[in-house]
Amino acid sequence: MNFPPIHPSTPKMTPPDLDPQKIPQHIAVIMDGNGRWATSRGLPRIAGHRQGARTLKELLRCCKDWGIKALTAYAFSTENWQRPIEEVDFLMLLFERLLRRELSQMHREGVRISFIGDLTALPKSLQTEMERSMTETLNNQAIHFTVAVNYGSRNEITRACRQVAELVQQGKLSADAVNEGIVEQHLYTTDTQPPDLLIRTSGEMRLSNFLLWQMAYTEMYFTDILWPDFDREAFHQALLSYQKRDRRFGQVKALISA
């Protein structure tokens, strides 16, 4: 099945073979394969990141068109600082340029933008653009677009536990009152529902320290397609796979049906 290019004026049209009642409300993506995509074409790795950014933009609009309410993208992990300095510098500059160029359009389309991760380690100019984009789009409701930058799930969970421990130490919280809900209040994603579906491209089949707490019951879809080549049809296939699954959240089917 072929689809027309995504455009801001394109009306919302869910493919006819997808059940609108079973569309996942929150999708998370691990965008893997930019470097391999570029290398296979004799291009520098940064060309893959540039094309990968276009793919993410298209996916965001597709999610919006098809009624998906939240998209979370793993853009830069805490481990990615170990990449060549030229590549890291390019990625930081790319993030900043994309925000400056795309913010107005996303704001008009009703996109709410959020960032999760340790943003304090990022260049000051990038932090400024991130703060501006989050502030300007805070009340938008068409789709919640979250980008994980300098993010590591173990760091996030450790940070949350440390904050809860400080509350207990200060006498503001009883140790007996600490539960999953309390910890979740101190995660970066406190105002976002857990992902229904994780998509990872390029054939890798691991979580890579991404949303470990939040994805306890998330369905996972792995594809060999490299991220820059992940188009509407590939996304459509991921959603078809998701809709064929029986989500039980740790229960047996009889209890869910009751």
UniProtKB/Swiss-Prot annotation:
The keyword Zinc does not apply. GO terms for biological process: polyprenol biosynthetic process. Pfam families: Prenyltransf (PF01255). GO terms for molecular function: ditrans,polycis-polyprenyl diphosphate synthase [(2E,6E)-farnesyl diphosphate specific] activity; magnesium ion binding. Its cofactor is Mg(2+). Residues 1-21 are annotated as: Disordered. Substrate binds at residues 33-37, 45, 49, 77-79, 81, 83, 200, 206-208. Mg(2+) binds at residues 32, 219. SUPFAM superfamilies: Undecaprenyl diphosphate synthase (SSF64005). Binds 2 magnesium ions per subunit. The active site is at 32, 80 (proton acceptor). It comes from the Bacteria. Homodimer. This is Isoprenyl transferase 2. The gene is uppS2.
